[in-house]
Amino acid sequence: RRRLEPEIAQRSCRLLSDAELDRLEREAVGFGAQDRTMNDIYDSHHEFHHALLAPAATSWDIRILSTLWRASERYIRIGWGSLDPDPQEHARREQYHVELVAAFRQRDPEVAADAVQQHLSRNEQTALLALGPGRSRVAPVS
């Protein structure tokens, strides 16, 4: 994912319409709703990331990414599910995804790639913390 997603983001940021970015921003804001758990948003979260990359992704890219996304699903649900009781987690979830859309809006390939790379790194670190010893007291990565 670290090699493929940033590379596709570099191309996609120039192809996404303003209307699609507006729609994705509204979706990102919805990820922060206090009443939505990770299980509630998982499918729309997957679709959000797919939509960010879709304009520049080949069918082969989507096939590979879908396999990788589904393979990581259990860890995402465990890691972020354990954070759901923390009201600040919902705000972070929203912020991280709004930041992704903002990076794509700049239409700068390096900015978009860096934002995706940072997003993946945060996710990896949070998942490792959530799955490690003492996971009941997970502190999310900022």
Please describe what each predicted stretch is.
Residues 14, 32-35:
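Amphipathic alpha-helical linker/stalk segments
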Residues 1-14, 19, 128-142:
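Short linear motifs at protein or domain termini
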Residues 21-24, 41-45, 61, 65, ...:
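Hydrophobic packing residues in well-ordered alpha-helices of helical domains and bundles
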Residues 25, 29-33, 77-142:
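C-terminal all-alpha effector/ligand-binding and dimerization domain
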Residues 3, 7, 11, 22-30, ...:
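Alpha-helical structural segments
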Residues 1-16, 46-86:
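Hydrophobic, amphipathic alpha-helical faces that serve as interaction scaffolds
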